[in-house]
């Protein structure tokens, strides 16, 4: 018996499969769809925001592209403002659908970063100096975006000592003065506040904000949405005509019947009905 084999190796080769989308299959129909979508988003309707984790800078699935989020979103808020080339192209794509792209500047995240770095021994500056430097760095990234979400949760000043209250106000002044200066220089862009209005000390920023996003993504029933709104309105200078409530989507874990639910009901749909 004789055995034989091929003497040449056969190398595997990846093949790029590009399935045509509706924009290529029917350009005229897609153009009409975009026109109708843009007209709707420019009309008077309930505004829908969505947060998008764009931390993956070498995407390996369509789910990591802003251009593949649902067209129904009015605003995408990215978690990382440092963008790479494919993300800039994605922004152009979603703009064609009338979707805006914002990024968030979080006071509380900056505070946590400074605290952690001080503990690690990698940061020696005061928080005030660190806050100013970080704000300047983040504001410098604003060019590709349609707006900024200024996030401030903080602590309730009612329970602060006078010294702590003065320090909190000084830090708020630093934070919101940079935000306000940016808004003054960019009147065509949007400013949104996210956080607890009751924790602001002598700040007038809310009157300049297009929307106020309340921290409600962890409430457990729809009645608490009204409670959060009433608590926000108890603070001085809070406009009542621009609240946005937040709700979580359901978990990918099918056994999790808590995340994204108000009791047994979907939180997203119930929050939409409440608005």
Predicted regions and their residues:
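Bacterial Sec-dependent N-terminal signal peptides
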Residues: 1-43
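Hydrophobic faces of well-ordered beta-strands that scaffold small-molecule active sites
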Residues: 48-50, 74-78, 101-105, 148-150, ...
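Acidic (Asp/Glu)-rich catalytic clusters
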Residues: 65-70, 85-103, 137-144, 201-207, ...
């Amino acid at each position: 018996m004789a055995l034989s084999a091929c003497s040449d190796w056969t190398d595997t080769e990846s093949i790029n499969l590009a399935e045509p989308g509706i924009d290529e299959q029917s350009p005229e129909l897609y153009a009409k769809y975009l026109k109708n979508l843009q007209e709707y988003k420019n009309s008077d309707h309930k505004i829908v925001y969505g947060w998008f984790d764009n931390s993956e800078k070498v995407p390996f699935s369509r789910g990591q592209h802003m251009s593949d989020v649902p067209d129904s979103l009015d605003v995408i808020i990215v978690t990382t403002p440092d963008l790479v080339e494919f993300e800039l192209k994605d922004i152009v794509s979603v703009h064609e659908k009338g979707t805006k792209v914002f990024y968030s500047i979080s006071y509380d995240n900056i505070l946590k970063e400074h605290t952690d770095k001080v503990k690690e021994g990698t940061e020696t500056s005061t928080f005030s100096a660190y806050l100013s430097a970080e704000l300047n760095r983040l504001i410098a990234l604003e060019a590709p975006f349609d707006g900024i979400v200024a996030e401030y949760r903080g602590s309730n000043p009612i329970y602060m000592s006078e010294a702590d209250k003065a320090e909190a106000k000084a830090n708020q002044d630093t934070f919101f003065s940079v935000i306000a200066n940016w808004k003054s220089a960019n009147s065509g862009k949007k400013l949104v506040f996210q956080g607890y209005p009751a924790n602001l000390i002598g700040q007038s920023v809310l009157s300049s904000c297009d929307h106020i996003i309340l921290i409600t993504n962890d409430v457990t029933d729809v009645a608490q949405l009204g409670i959060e709104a009433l608590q926000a309105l108890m603070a001085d200078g809070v406009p009542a005509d621009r609240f946005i409530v937040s709700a979580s989507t359901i978990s990918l874990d099918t056994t999790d019947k808590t995340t994204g639910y108000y009791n047994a009901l979907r939180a997203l749909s119930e929050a939409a009905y409440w608005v």
